[in-house]
């Protein structure tokens, strides 16, 4: 009984174990299935994740480009806005209003008068009651000039009435250097010979005179001496300041020529008379008057409007006195008194000439009590020669004196335009080489 019980218990235990084993196997199978499913799900999830990542990479590239383009647009818009703000600030806060530039002529003149500092003082003069009514207009015109001259004399401490004459030693040295340089250039390049020869060749000669040939040119070796300089008021109504300077020159300036006088009657070249002439200036002295004038002044324009009488020999006994009468002439361009512009000259050339003759100019003339000495040598004939004929000498000397009087003796004068003294770049020079003592050996133009 007991064995049956034990057997039955054992069988029950064995059956229970078998059940447990089957249950365990079932659980293991289900666990393996779950693991397989989980692994499959993980693989599927991994694939989905990879696909999702690929989709994210593809889709994220487009927003990045859009984001980059938006930043560029913002940068450009920002820069433009800054430029606009700066332009508005400069226009309205730095520059003036454009309407201010469109002012009238009167307001422009008013602004100019406010910029230029005028230091002219009112001139004290006599009342109109004490003046001649006929001279009121002239006095009104001359009063600014007289005031200016008085101011100059006052500020330079120069007394016209009591100032002693001055020597011009320094001026003599400068003039001597200039003349020496001109003589050197004339001797080296022979330009004085070529210019005189061209003038004589191109001159219109009468039919009875053959070609003129140069035989002697002597430009001298001495220099003029200027002395006894004094400043005086002009004798005319302008009252301008003039410098009176004594000039003395003792030198020999010679010009020698030879030609032939042709006798063409009754047939051409019937006879030929050789002529040799030599004219020398051996002494000149006189009082030189120098003044700076403005060619735009009314008094000078009045002188330009007066035509010069044609020079010619006068048979009247007082011809020399008539030459020295105060007849104003036009010597503004330092030409001969008979050089009157032809009627065929165009308006453009006249306007250009008038424009060139305006501005500051140097006026000079000599007093009538000058001294001019000549030495004239002549030789006429071929085989039998006449030497130093007095009549020929006096005729040539008279012509030369008349030529000089008609151009340079008061009241006539010569006018030389003064070049502009304003510093210019093209006139700038600089030393490029110097020796051990610091003396400049060579100069060249400064770079422009």
Curated annotation (Swiss-Prot):
Q: Which GO terms describe its molecular function?
A: lipid binding
Which InterPro entries does the record match to this protein? Mmm1, MMM1_dom, SMP_LBD
**Which Pfam families did the record assign?**
MMM1
Subcellular location(s): the record lists: Endoplasmic reticulum membrane
Cytoplasmic topological domain: 96-448
| Membrane topology label | Single-pass type I membrane protein
Which intervals carry biased composition (Basic and acidic residues)? 127-140, 345-356
What GO CC annotations are associated with the protein?
Answer: endoplasmic reticulum membrane; ERMES complex
Region described as Disordered: 119-144, 303-357
**What biological-process terms (Gene Ontology) are attached?**
mitochondrial genome maintenance; mitochondrion-endoplasmic reticulum membrane tethering; phospholipid transport; protein insertion into mitochondrial outer membrane
Task: State the UniProt keywords alphabetically.
Answer: Endoplasmic reticulum, Lipid transport, Lipid-binding, Membrane, Transmembrane, Transmembrane helix, Transport
> Its principal location?
endoplasmic reticulum
Going by the entry's taxonomy, the superkingdom of the source organism is recorded as Eukaryota
| Boundaries of every SMP-LTD domain copy | 164-419
Report TM segments.
75-95
**Lumenal topology: which positions?**
1-74
Q: Where in the sequence does UniProt note compositional bias of the Low complexity kind?
A: 313-332
The residues forming the signal peptide are none
Q: What is known of its domains?
A: The SMP-LTD domain is a barrel-like domain that can bind various types of glycerophospholipids in its interior and mediate their transfer between two adjacent bilayers.
What quaternary arrangement does the UniProt entry report?
Homodimer. Component of the ER-mitochondria encounter structure (ERMES) or MDM complex, composed of MMM1, MDM10, MDM12 and MDM34. A MMM1 homodimer associates with one molecule of MDM12 on each side in a pairwise head-to-tail manner, and the SMP-LTD domains of MMM1 and MDM12 generate a continuous hydrophobic tunnel for phospholipid trafficking.
Q: Which family does it belong to?
A: Belongs to the MMM1 family.
List, alphabetically, the PANTHER family matched: SMP-LTD DOMAIN-CONTAINING PROTEIN (PTHR13466:SF0), TEX2 PROTEIN-RELATED (PTHR13466)
Please give the function described in this protein's UniProt entry. Answer: Component of the ERMES/MDM complex, which serves as a molecular tether to connect the endoplasmic reticulum (ER) and mitochondria. Components of this complex are involved in the control of mitochondrial shape and protein biogenesis, and function in nonvesicular lipid trafficking between the ER and mitochondria. The MDM12-MMM1 subcomplex functions in the major beta-barrel assembly pathway that is responsible for biogenesis of all outer membrane beta-barrel proteins, and acts in a late step after the SAM complex.
**Could you tell me what this protein is called?**
Maintenance of mitochondrial morphology protein 1
- Organism of this sequence: Debaryomyces hansenii (strain ATCC 36239 / CBS 767 / BCRC 21394 / JCM 1990 / NBRC 0083 / IGC 2968)
Primary gene name: MMM1
